[in-house]
């Protein structure tokens, strides 16, 4: 399978586990690099990476055939990590004060 084929399969079925696994395995360095940039390493980064792959699968319909699949994936990963980080900041800001302090 190629990245292009995996993205095409996800555009038809975002739940195609084989296609998600292929993209993750074939683009591990890019994905880990983007996640580390936004979330560092550890538990939060691991959770973010799982959500990131799900969101990339859901965005596969936005892929244009003339696009470079690697560039598309890197762009999606970056924008989705930015979105995830902003969601986490928003959630933490709206958490009750006592609970926010217990989460550090």
Language-model segments: residues:
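A short, charge-rich alpha-helical start-of-domain segment used by transcription regulators
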Residues: 11-33
